[in-house]
Regions:
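Nucleotide phosphate-binding/pyrophosphate-handling subdomain across enzymes
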Residues: 1-59
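Phosphate- and divalent-cation-binding pockets in alpha/beta enzyme and binding domains
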Residues: 23, 71-72, 117
């Protein structure tokens, strides 16, 4: 995980390398502040139920980012927190910025491969960091 910036009291963390649910689980487990989670991309047959409890405990907003968010929407529909769909990293970061509060962390930990919108996870991370810095 890579610290990106703190903007208006909100920390932004890049965990673009978390291309599976297990990696996202560890990232969420380490969060010590209320979290806005950005996730999504090319699903690899993920079992998202592995992170349900941590999302309920740690997150107050989910932001789905990708060309096809239908599996994420379907899975997390029963979790009673705001869920926002976006189709690019810039909109995902803007939505996170609008929904985060002072003291929160915005975490990009996608659970998915990056190939729907990016060349690879490094490209996704760079675009995330650039979008944060452009807020």
């Amino acid at each position: 995980m890579q610290y990106v910036a703190t903007i208006r009291g909100v920390r932004y963390i890049n965990d673009s390398k978390a291309t599976n649910v297990n990696s996202c689980w560890y990232a969420l487990e380490s969060m010590t502040t209320p979290t806005v989670l950005i996730l999504g991309g090319t699903d690899k047959g993920n079992d998202y139920s592995e992170i349900d409890d941590l999302i309920k405990e740690k997150c107050h907003t989910l932001i789905f980012m990708g060309k096809d968010n239908s599996k994420l929407i379907e899975h997390f529909a029963s979790i009673n927190i705001p869920q926002i769909c976006t189709d690019n990293i810039q909109d995902a970061v803007k939505a996170a910025y609008q929904n985060a509060q002072v003291g929160d962390t915005v975490l990009l930990s996608p659970c998915c491969a990056s190939f729907d919108l990016f060349h690879n996870y490094e490209d996704r991370g760079i675009q995330y960091m650039n979008a944060v810095r452009n807020l």
